Design a protein with these regions (language model features):
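Catalytic Zn2+-binding segment of zinc metalloproteases
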Residues: 60-77
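Active-site scaffold of zinc-dependent metalloenzymes
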Residues: 8-51, 63-67
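Alpha-helical hydrophobic/aromatic positions enriched in membrane-embedded helices and signal peptides
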Residues: 50-54, 73
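A short, structured loop/turn motif at beta-sheet edges
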Residues: 56-58
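Post-HExxH zinc-binding segment in Zn-dependent metallohydrolases
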Residues: 75-104
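N-terminal soluble segments of membrane proteins
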Residues: 1-15, 101-104
Length: 104
């Protein structure tokens, strides 16, 4: 997962990045890192001010849904704990970018 504060498509680095939607605060794309030949998820925030608790929660759920889809897992009442832990981990990663305080 990559987190960026930019509306750039980073086309020199990633494949699969959508053009910026001017009505959005943030966009999530499933991408391929061309430098390392790795798949992953890129979340872009329009600005540092767009990284709000509400947007972190919203984008984290999109990211977790994409990861569940990729691994063939279903989001349902039977495995909501696993999904919720993943959403929390994603939200924490985004919050580290927001605060500039990164965990080792």
């Amino acid at each position: 997962m990559w987190v960026a504060v930019s509306t750039d498509t980073f086309s020199d680095r990633f494949e699969g990045v959508s053009e910026w939607d001017d009505t959005a605060d943030a966009i999530v794309d499933c991408v391929r890192d061309k430098l390392r030949n790795l798949g992953g998820i890129l979340v872009r925030f329009e600005s540092k001010n767009a990284i709000t608790i509400a947007n972190i929660a919203h984008e984290s759920s999109h990211i977790a849904m994409n990861i569940f889809d990729y691994i063939g897992a279903k989001v349902d009442l039977a495995n909501q704990e696993t999904f919720s832990y993943l959403v929390g981990w994603v939200a924490d990663c985004i919050n580290q970018v927001r605060t500039g305080k990164f965990k080792d």
